[in-house]
Amino acid sequence: MALRFPRFSQGLAQDPTTRRIWFGIATAHDFESHDDITEERLYQNIFASHFGQLAIIFLWTSGNLFHVAWQGNFESWIQDPLHVRPIAHAIWDPHFGQPAVEAFTRGGAIGPVNIAYSGVYQWWYTIGLRTNEDLYTGALFLLCLSAISLIAGWLHLQPKWKPSLSWFKNAESRLNHHLSGLFGVSSLAWAGHLVHVAIPGSRGEYVRWNNFLNVLPHPQGLEPLLTGQWNLYAQNSDSSSHLFGTSKGAGTAILTLLGGFHPQTQSLWLTDIAHHHLAIAFLFLVAGHMYRTNFGIGHSIKDLLEAHIPPGGRLGRGHKGLYDTINNSIHFQLGLALASLGVITSLVAQHMYSLPAYAFIAQDFTTQAALYTHHQYIAGFIMTGAFAHGAIFFIRDYNPEQNEDNVLARMLDHKEAIISHLSWASLFLGFHTLGLYVHNDVMLAFGTPEKQILIEPIFAQWIQSAHGKTSYGFDVLLSSTNGPAFNAGRSIWLPGWLNAINENSNSLFLTIGPGDFLVHHAIALGLHTTTLILVKGALDARGSKLMPDKKDFGYSFPCDGPGRGGTCDISAWDAFYLAVFWMLNTIGWVTFYWHWKHITLWQGNVSQFNESSTYLMGWLRDYLWLNSSQLINGYNPFGMNSLSVWAWMFLFGHLVWATGFMFLISWRGYWQELIETLAWAHERTPLANLIRWRDKPVALSIVQARLVGLAHFSVGYIFTYAAFLIASTSGKFG
């Protein structure tokens, strides 16, 4: 008999129903559950798949470069970044009539095109790319890297090149190489690129391989480095009248501490960025030499952890047993990696708009909005994944004997206190915030807006003032003109910071009031509730008072049959599933807040946000409804326009989102009956009954239907908001 899908599970392959296909797809990446898997093969498979992942990333970025070089307008955009719209790629669509062709032909193109809202033009311009040839070269280079990655992945699956289990378990060596090699050397290389290519490029000097060795990045070369006069590299920085990409107003400094933004590009000074990467490189190169490997010097991570026993025995045996627990659990390691990456991604969203690093990106409002929203949603999915794998760790990998009375065991021992405190915080935030919003709604409805409860965020304003924002009149730390920190800041360090923080045209430390106070607490409610669900799911994954033997049922189970009431919906998977809805809604509030606040800032009518954001009707009417007007006007006498595609996507997103509920609010028996009726009709219909199936059609399992529903809900939700965000922003600002 020919091998049927899935080949990794002979038990599933022999299943006579369509369950074989769905369960096969669901467990394809759960290598641990595959037939004949060993720990060594598990590590080797994951290692090889990383190369495949890299190949896909390189291919994708290569495609971006290639299409912009081929169909974009990079060279004409460079001439006037503020007024030429950057083109992502051409659109070829046989359905386009003349109105559509005209609507989508823009940015100086000869036919219909898509506009780029990803910020790649600004990024490439900042790092020194100037011609289409540069873009093609980059695309080709990344294509080669992609091919090399694929070959490396294949190679590491060959018997001779398969790394051993001990190689994967060597934490010290891996940490040294990742810290020094991955972060240290790459940061140093990037600092080098900025100094040798990007900074000269910003001063009108075109450095490529043919003149790379002839152009000195600094007039004094390596002399200041070798003689210890490093401050010479910071002298004669670009002036405030510097025109980016030209020598007009340019200086010669390469490593500075100016602070603030380049007046023309509204982005961080390139010389500050180079300095930052050099410092990061130094730190990581040092950090990558800290752990003990072949030479018997440096720290042993196990010894470090075992020594961490808090005084007074207040945390039991401290970190004893943690080294082996983490080192032997891929899920624990993945959970830690995802938690870190999730936080970093959210920080990227925050910093890309508040401290923009790329030239002219701050004036491309649609791109700013798209990048913020994109990174926040990505962060949300990554963070929920961290808790999912944390729960799988507790079910599959946690060993109580190995972790007796250490910090991990003690987390489980007092989980009731953790969960109930989170629950209390969520309830407090939810009822108080909703209470304030609803009170304000009623006051507005009754025509007495002066009776609203409006709370000034004085603590946050004080923190902003301490960092130098003077508009609140707090006169503290950096906003106190008489203080030593203020006076030192004008000359010694970051002289541009205080100018930037008090400049109203950027997004640095936005002025906040009662509307911000309320939405901040609404977001805090969402964050705490999402965390509550995720933390409870992980801490109760092994068992709870209701179901002490939960771990024996695995990560995702629907119920333990009818004989045992109350065991439905309490698997660790169900907690993850529920948390994703909360995560999406929380990030919805975050992005609504960010977008509305910025639209009013960019349009110069901040009072609209300040006055309308203190009650729910204000959000619904003046943000959602008002800004979706271009998307919901249906067919009109003017026909097609460049926002039509977003209007269609807005509708389609709602459709996908609503389809999710068909899977979420239904029961398996209903679908099973429907399928059997359809199968009966199929078998009795002439011609149709010539087509037979090998697998008996059965309804999706409860857990699978939930996953399908969740996927539709998530994708529809994001499609809908993406269309709204891009159309409402580009419709106003072009």
UniProtKB/Swiss-Prot annotation:
Keyword Iron-sulfur: yes
Positions annotated to bind chlorophyll a B1: H654
Name of this protein: Photosystem I P700 chlorophyll a apoprotein A2
SUPFAM superfamilies according to UniProt: Photosystem I subunits PsaA/PsaB (SSF81558)
Catalytic activity: reduced [plastocyanin] + hnu + oxidized [2Fe-2S]-[ferredoxin] = oxidized [plastocyanin] + reduced [2Fe-2S]-[ferredoxin]
EC number(s) on file: 1.97.1.12
Free-text cofactor note: P700 is a chlorophyll a/chlorophyll a' dimer, A0 is one or more chlorophyll a, A1 is one or both phylloquinones and FX is a shared 4Fe-4S iron-sulfur center.
Annotated membrane topology: Multi-pass membrane protein
Annotated GO biological process: photosynthesis
Keyword Hydrolase among UniProt keywords: no
EC class of the enzyme, as a word: oxidoreductase
Signal peptide coordinates: none
Cellular compartment(s): Plastid, Chloroplast thylakoid membrane
Subunit comment: The PsaA/B heterodimer binds the P700 chlorophyll special pair and subsequent electron acceptors. PSI consists of a core antenna complex that captures photons, and an electron transfer chain that converts photonic excitation into a charge separation. The eukaryotic PSI reaction center is composed of at least 11 subunits.
Annotated residues for binding of chlorophyll a B3: M662, Y670
GO annotations of cellular component type: chloroplast thylakoid membrane; photosystem I
Family: Belongs to the PsaA/PsaB family.
Pfam families in UniProt: PsaA_PsaB
Binding positions for [4Fe-4S] cluster per the UniProt entry: C559, C568
Any one Gene Ontology molecular-function term assigned to this protein's record: electron transfer activity
Protein residues bound to phylloquinone: W671
TM stretches of this protein: 46-69, 135-158, 175-199, 273-291, 330-353, 369-395, 417-439, 517-535, 575-596, 643-665, 707-727
Function: PsaA and PsaB bind P700, the primary electron donor of photosystem I (PSI), as well as the electron acceptors A0, A1 and FX. PSI is a plastocyanin-ferredoxin oxidoreductase, converting photonic excitation into a charge separation, which transfers an electron from the donor P700 chlorophyll pair to the spectroscopically characterized acceptors A0, A1, FX, FA and FB in turn. Oxidized P700 is reduced on the lumenal side of the thylakoid membrane by plastocyanin.
Keywords per UniProt: 4Fe-4S, Chlorophyll, Chloroplast, Chromophore, Electron transport, Iron, Iron-sulfur, Magnesium, Membrane, Metal-binding, Oxidoreductase, Photosynthesis, Photosystem I, Plastid, Thylakoid, Transmembrane, Transmembrane helix, Transport
